[in-house]
Amino acid sequence: NFVSVMATENNTQVDFSDLPPGIIIENNTPTSVVLNYGESYVIALNPAAAPANRDGLVGALVSATKPIVVNCGSSNGSNSTGNGRDFGIDQIAPFETISIDGQSYSEYIFVRANGYDDIERPLIVAHLDNTAVYVNGDDTTGTLLVNLSAGEYISIDGTYFSNQSVSGSNPGGNMYVWTSKTAFAYQGIGGSSNEANQELFFVPPMNCKTPKTINNIPLIQNTGTGSVAFLGGITIVSEVGASVLVNGAATTALPQTVNGNPNFETYLVSGLSGNVSV
């Protein structure tokens, strides 16, 4: 598990804080550093070194005196209790970016892929104390899961996704999550029913400024070769009644209603290759 940062300006002070007791940082790397333009720095935890290392960076606070680039994730991680592992890495946005002017809460809609419930799990990380997390509705209509303090997190069970099947795997199901204060979100997904084929990515909150066009996603199928090759797929969240075009043509994927927010619907479009636009 790791967090990497890169400075965009000289003399940038970077601090890593809110780290739990009991962790062992690789190479005893200091948790405070000054970087110049283009320099990078990594804090890493080996889960085999200490039990606290398994989730010791989830909820850690990265702060800097000047703008930085931050990537985080795991090179050998899993949501599953099985032995399968895989990479899960993404670039994240700062708190100021995910905060919405005039709005104290966050809304998220997650769309599941091809994994089972223990792999298909949203991860909510609180940035502020007293952050209540609800599923399938807000603080009036939803189910309260937990009240988090700053730096705490919840990994939401995949059974909360809509349209569950007997096997626990139903690609395209969705989940609406509402947090009483601005919070960060990540999503674990599965490329197949094999627990080793999983991924983790950063999820931005719902925002009226979200772009209507994504052009393009290059060579979407190029994620592996041989026995681990996948056809490309995308998940889409749109307003109800929107015309959804994939590569200029109306998608044949069926929309799924969102339990907890009837103004939106979701799609899972699979079997794609080449460059993709939405």
Label the predicted regions:
Residues 1-59, 63-277:
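Conserved functional hotspot residues at active sites or interaction interfaces
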